[in-house]
A protein has these predicted regions:
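Beta-strand-centric surfaces of beta-sandwich/beta-rich domains
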Residues: 26-395, 401
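Bacterial N-terminal signal peptides that target proteins for export
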Residues: 1-9
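Extracytoplasmic copper-binding redox domains, predominantly the cupredoxin/blue-copper superfamily
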Residues: 393-553
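C-terminal segment of classical bacterial N-terminal signal peptides
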Residues: 15-23
Length: 553
């Protein structure tokens, strides 16, 4: 993705975007390494089109720093020009995304409107290296280490941009800012190359590396679900279906010669609490690092208003050949289920021999002290991640208190079309028609079938809009955001994303446009539901309090 005609004007606009809110005195921010010949650059893709309601998992190509503009330092952008033979080290990587408004203005979109579900930079000749989710963690390698790459190198770019609205015709840039230290001749000795070992609890062979963290999956009843540790081996136990999602990519065995771990920071989704790194040698296991989710969100672990902790500058781990590092991730399932969850931990690894590195088993006290000290944030609160519309009182009626007035669920079920459920569906906006919110009635024990007319077989990916039917706790009628509604209905059901994705989106969707709920059994009960992808979409169904033929008020 290249666009050389865009230069200083765009870079200046990006620079003026609202910065992260300053951290409090209790939340120190990790500083970046510094070198006399280091230069900071801003980079961005060409414009990426955004379709109504999209949640596409896509692949593109990019360069080390396309559309490069110097921010500070002695260098110039020619090191990234086509045909450049320059080599250098990336010592800091700060990802983000901006929307291109019709007048050319660049704005960081709010997470409840349009957000960067994930983006992964795949290194030339290697694997996943830099990445971001909505929390936008910065990579800040410690002094003396960097990721070595050519200035004109080709990279892969896997990205998933989630449009939570029905508005199309939008465009964004994926952006990143890097600190670049040039290689010299003879080769410099003050920076050692570090590469990434990508740990992923639900990665390969899955293309879309997710699992479900549901209420009731915590085997000890503590409300915390540790994946993959708490996935049962008994097929009759709740959560056994997640077993097939456990990936061998969650662990790595150190090759001959040993290794030094120099940096790590985890990625998880709302509901996630922490990502843990441990090492095993000769049957003994030692904890190395916990990447904690620091939620600014007043409601707790329910939104993207979060920053992740990374390892501190003095964190160095010396490993021997045959040692195995592994990761796990923990979710809070005490009050909601979290579908399509992630647990990823990119670990930067260098050659053995750093005298400051500590061996987990020979220097166990020092390693334990580093673990107990905990991590450090790479940035403060991001204004775009404040979930300000969630849980707003929209003055909408409680579906449980509305009479159905003869409305029934048709034998064909409920249709989804034009970003709405019908009958019984509504948009969570002020002033919505009360008559359309009235819940349709079914007989006790009925399973209701939904058909997504927004994503029928044969439609292209960009024509489709994928929706879910996910149970929520009544009244489920407050303002939409990341942290509301939550998947916490009295009957646990979730359809997955109904539609027909292809290529990298194959596993994002169910491969069907139809979903049928479990039986709805409780007489007189009004069941509410929403779409996880477009949470302004709501609906309800009422079970008749007496035989269907006698009618309902």
């Amino acid at each position: 993705m290249r666009q050389r005609c865009v230069g200083g004007l765009i870079a200046a606009a990006i620079a003026l975007l609202a910065p992260a809110a300053p951290a409090s005195a209790d939340d120190p921010i990790l500083g970046a390494a510094s070198y006399p010949d280091m230069t900071t650059y801003r980079c961005h893709t060409d414009a990426i089109p955004i379709y109504p309601g999209q949640n596409l998992n896509l692949l593109a190509t990019t360069k080390t720093c396309p559309n490069a503009v110097k921010v500070s330092g002695p260098g110039d952008a020619s090191v990234f020009a086509p045909g450049s033979t320059a080599q250098g080290y990336i010592t800091r990587f700060a990802p983000s995304m901006v929307e291109i408004k019709p007048d050319g203005q660049l704005v960081t979109p709010s997470v409840w409107d349009l957000h960067l579900h994930h983006v992964v930079w795949v290194a030339p000749g290697g694997g996943p290296t830099f990445a971001s989710g909505e929390e936008k963690t910065h990579v800040k390698l410690p002094q003396g280490y960097g990721f070595k790459v050519a200035g004109d190198a080709n990279w892969g770019l896997n990205y998933m941009i989630h449009n939570l609205t029905a508005v199309g015709g939008r465009q964004v840039y994926i952006t990143w800012e890097i600190d670049w230290v040039p290689e010299t001749a003879p080769a410099r000795t003050d920076i050692k190359p570090a590469n990434v070992r990508w740990l992923d609890v639900a990665g390969f062979p899955q293309i879309y590396p997710v699992f479900d963290a549901e209420r009731g999956f915590d085997t000890n009843g503590d409300g915390k679900y540790v994946f993959p540790d708490e996935v049962p081996t008994d097929p009759s136990q709740p959560g056994y279906e997640e077993r097939r999602k456990i990936s061998s990519a969650r662990q790595w065995t150190v090759p001959a010669g040993g290794a030094t771990l120099v940096f790590a920071a985890g990625h998880l989704h709302p509901g996630g609490l922490h990502v843990d790194l441990q090492v095993t040698r000769g049957g003994q296991t030692m904890q190395l690092f916990r990447s904690d989710a620091h939620y600014y969100e007043p409601a707790g672990a329910v939104s993207w208003d979060v920053s992740m902790t990374a390892t501190r500058p003095d964190w160095r781990i010396s490993l021997q050949a045959g040692d195995t590092i592994s990761e796990s991730v923990t979710y809070d399932v005490s009050r909601a289920s979290w579908y399509e969850s992630m647990g990823i931990l990119p670990v930067f690894v260098a050659a053995a021999g750093d005298p400051a590195a500590k061996d987990p088993f020979n220097d166990d006290a020092a390693v334990r002290a580093m673990y107990d000290e905990g991590g450090i944030l790479t940035h403060g609160r991001l204004p775009e991640n404040v979930d300000k519309k969630a849980r707003k009182d929209l003055k909408l009626p409680d579906p449980r208190k509305l009479k159905s007035k003869g409305r029934r669920v048709p034998k064909s079920g409920i249709d989804i079309g034009g970003f709405g459920y019908s009958p019984g569906g509504y948009s969570a906006v002020r002033g919505y028609s009360v008559n359309r919110i009235r819940p349709p009635v079914v007989r006790p024990g009925t399973s209701v079938t939904f058909t997504n007319l927004d994503a029928l077989f044969g439609m292209s990916q960009t024509e489709q809009t994928w929706h879910t039917i996910t149970s929520c706790s009544a009244p489920c009628n407050l303002g939409s955001g990341i942290g509301y509604p939550l998947a916490r209905g009295p009957i646990k059901f979730d359809s997955g994303q109904l539609g027909y994705g292809n290529a990298l989106s194959t596993e994002v969707t169910t491969g069907s446009d139809v979903y049928t709920t479990p039986p709805l059994t409780k007489r007189g009960k009004t069941y509410t539901y929403f779409c996880r992808i477009h949470p302004f979409m709501r609906g309800s169904i009422r079970v008749a309090p007496r035989p269907h033929g006698h009618g309902h008020a």
